[in-house]
From Swiss-Prot:
Miscellaneous comment text of the record: The structure of the E beta gene is more similar to class I MHC genes than to class II, in that, unlike either the E alpha or DR alpha genes, (1) the core portion of the E beta cytoplasmic segment is encoded by its own exon and (2) the sixth exon of the E beta chain is not split into two exons, but rather encodes both the carboxyl end of the cytoplasmic segment and the entire 3'-UTR.
Keyword Isomerase: no
Name this polypeptide is given: H-2 class II histocompatibility antigen, E-D beta chain
GO CC aspect terms: late endosome membrane; lysosomal membrane; MHC class II protein complex
Domain of life of the source: Eukaryota
Organism: Mus musculus (Mouse)
Xref: Pfam families: C1-set, MHC_II_beta
Subcellular location: Membrane
Length: 264
């Protein structure tokens, strides 16, 4: 959630400095125009558990100065903003006002608006798969794909045989889908051993309980046996279906025949 801009705070007033040509001018005014404005943003994480206030100063579409409540002071983005940053950081009352904006501006507006907002939550879709289809006891990368969820605060953890893995984990971070949902990939670098069970656990505000998806490390022979069993089962179903079809078709044909000699 972002609030833009602050009113009536002078720092949030959008200043448009434009030199207009006189109405009696007969030629096009080629003098330069200048645009300077300030944005005030409130970033909320898990409600108001953590609030970040950002104030950005932009001149001709280039940010030159900002205040970040996580930093606690003004920082120059370009040399143009350095004099103002040094000046305002030397004035305790200005810094105190900016730091207090987390409560006086962000949390204040959140508490008012929260009563009228509908909380949108979308449950994530979780899948687990290896990046390589190679034999066990070789280096591999297990991927936990978490997609189409909202809001963006999510926790993804890897377990091996019930014990949490804390090393060898790589994440893409949050990726915006462009439709108000997010996705992320959390990968575990490991050397799978036969019989090991890897579990990806996902916690999200839309879920009452964590979602867990398992991946079992199996040898090539075990996988072949499983595939053979599945293939045999499917083949058996096909033969059963064909047999039932022939049986019911014959039954229907016999019921349609009437013995000769009946009186009507």
């Amino acid at each position: 959630m972002v609030w833009l801009p602050r009113v009536p705070c002078v720092a949030a007033v959008i200043l448009l400095l434009t030199v207009l040509s006189p109405p009696v001018a007969l030629v096009r005014d080629t003098r330069p125009r200048f645009l300077e404005y300030v944005t005030s943003e409130c970033h909320f994480y898990n409600g108001t558990q953590h609030v970040r206030f950002l104030e950005r100063f932009i001149y001709n579409r280039e940010e030159n100065l900002r205040f970040d409540s996580d930093v606690g002071e003004y920082r120059a983005v370009t040399e143009l903003g350095r004099p103002d940053a040094e000046n305002w950081n030397s004035q305790p009352e200005i810094l105190e006002d900016a730091r207090a904006s987390v409560d006086t501006y962000c949390r204040h507006n959140y508490e008012i608006s929260d009563k009228f907002l509908v909380r949108r939550r979308v449950e994530p879709t979780v899948t687990v798969y290896p990046t390589k289809t190679q034999p066990l006891e070789h280096h591999n990368l297990l991927v936990c794909s978490v997609s189409d969820f909202y809001p963006g605060n999510i926790e993804v953890r890897w377990f091996r045989n019930g014990k949490e893995e804390e090393t060898g984990i790589v994440s893409t971070g949050l990726v915006r889908n462009g439709d108000w949902t997010f996705q992320t990939l959390v990968m575990l670098e490991t050397v799978p051993q036969s019989g090991e069970v890897y579990t990806c656990q996902v916690e999200h505000p839309s879920l009452t309980d964590p979602v867990t998806v398992e991946w079992k490390a199996q040898s090539t022979s075990a996988q072949n046996k499983m595939l053979s069993g599945v293939g045999g089962f499917v083949l058996g179903l096909l033969f059963l279906g064909a047999g039932l079809f022939i049986y019911f078709r014959n039954q229907k044909g016999q019921s349609g025949l009437q013995p000769t000699g009946l009186l009507s």
